[in-house]
Amino acid sequence: MIEESGNKRKTMAEKRQLFIEMRAQNFDVIRLSTYRTACKLRFVQKRCNLHLVDIWNMIEAFRDNGLNTLDHTTEISVSRLETVISSIYYQLNKRLPSTHQISVEQSISLLLNFMIAAYDSEGRGKLTVFSVKAMLATMCGGKMLDKLRYVFSQMSDSNGLMIFSKFDQFLKEVLKLPTAVFEGPSFGYTEHSVRTCFPQQRKIMLNMFLDTMMADPPPQCLVWLPLMHRLAHVENVFHPVECSYCRCESMMGFRYRCQQCHNYQLCQNCFWRGHAGGPHSNQHQMKEHSSWKSPAKKLSHAISKSLGCVPTREPPHPVFPEQPEKPLDLAHIVPPRPLTNMNDTMVSHMSSGVPTPTKRLQYSQDIPSHLADEHALIASYVARLQHCARVLDSPSRLDEEHRLIARYAARLAAEAGNVTRPPTDLSFNFDANKQQRQLIAELENKNREILQEIQRLRLEHEQASQPTPEKAQQNPTLLAELRLLRQRKDELEQRMSALQESRRELMVQLEELMKLLKEEEQKQAAQATGSPHTSPTHGGGRPMPMPVRSTSAGSTPTHCPQDSLSGVGGDVQEAFAQGTRRNLRNDLLVAADSITNTMSSLVKELHSAEEGAEEEEEKMQNGKDRG
């Protein structure tokens, strides 16, 4: 008992799953019932993966399950309905790539429970064939024109006239879909639904039916149907326009432009929910846009329209012939003919080995006439397929195809059963078959060798693209040179560091010496000031020279000694700027300049070593690539 109650709860949860997910989308906040109904049914269509199945795949599934041979009022059980739905989704997965496979079991469960909730509210466990066809043809993907053509073929007689009673039955079935998504008060079936579609009781042909259903606006009871198709077309349309209410920088889907407010545009979410701001009101007329045109395109279109260069608008659908196509009578097109041998065109050989013509050769002259008959049959079918892109689902057409296939199968079976060949023909055919088998074996061997070569080349390419330590050891000479270059580079860097340290120490010593010289000069100046024999030219002291910033590191002390002292303290530069009064200053200047020259040569040597190392690395890498 506990298990049974648990299974019942699980079954009820599965039945309510689709409706729970639909309520979670919060479609009820949409203000207009037409958009609300279309959004709900579009959600059901995508959730059940019906948008991946077009009307032609549905017709094929109906034929595979024998629904085209049943009367519209025939009732089928839920188990058979599940079989039909299973065949639809399993065939769909065969057509889809492996990366886009769907969950077949989940899709079957969702669609089956939705159809039972919509068409078997009384719980009888049976649905009519017409209900199944109407629902699946309406909810599947594909073009609306193809769907309406198929629906009309199910409601018309042999003369191509619509039967109003069947159209009324179609409205009853298709309007159960809005009722199933809780929109029955807006789009439920009434007795006057047929009159709203066709007010005048007259003969309705295919073109008139298509004109009415695809008109703008369509019949009131079916206004949600073309809107659902438009929703599918504009789901991924991008509009680089800012919404005037929510200030979203861009829009996806529909775009609505007010006809009264200047440059007032709303995204579909704001328009569906009735949002308005500023001078705009919900009572203003809005224009729906399903695409975006730049101002340049609008201007060019306006100019072309004013000049009369715009082509006339194409009709919403092609014009189809008023009279339906007459079924082909296969008894006259493929008349029965005497059963003949497949080898009647061969020449029989006598025991002497001399080829002698017999009645087989005479019969070979009649073959062109039979081939002409078959070619005429094929040409007629090709013409029909060119005129009608896809043969509609009708029992008479299926019976003709079955009769044609059965006749050809019987002919081939009889020809295969009544074959009588002379021994010479059998031996000749045996030799030919043997040669063919040998040729096939040779081709298979060549194919196998080619595949092995392709696999070998692929492995070599993978090994070449992924270098390993073993491969790196294949050229020890290059590795040794690279190792020496790196070692030399390290040594040069260490030497440069040591020279920089020595330069810093020398600069410190220079600073100390210059301080001593400056102090000595100050003492001498003080003594000269205090002595009465001091010359008056030395009484006022001397001005301090301004430091000079160096722009060259390689100048000699005889031309511009200040250029050699860039980077040292101001005291050093000041001392050397006063002239060459002492040998100590000259010695210091020469030492500083030699340090600078040594550093320059070291830097150049280091750069040349680095460039050489880079060239060697490139050579080694090129050698690896060629290897």
Curated annotation (Swiss-Prot):
Gene source species: Homo sapiens (Human)
Induction and repression of expression: Post-transcriptionally repressed by microRNA miR-143 during neural differentiation.
SUPFAM superfamilies for the chain: EF-hand, RING/U-box
Lineage: Eukaryota, Metazoa, Chordata, Craniata, Vertebrata
Post-translational modification: Phosphorylated by PKA. Phosphorylation at Thr-11 alters the interaction with KIF5A.
Superkingdom, taxonomy of origin: Eukaryota
Cellular component, GO, one term: cytoplasm
Tissue expression pattern: Highly expressed in brain, kidney and pancreas.
Zinc finger (ZZ-type): 238-294
Protein name as it appears in the record: Dystrobrevin beta
Transferase recorded as keyword: no
Region annotation (Syntrophin-binding region) ranges: 399-448
GO BP: neuron differentiation; synaptic signaling
Residues modified to Phosphoserine: S394
Residues recorded with modification Phosphothreonine: T11, T69, T179, T212, T424
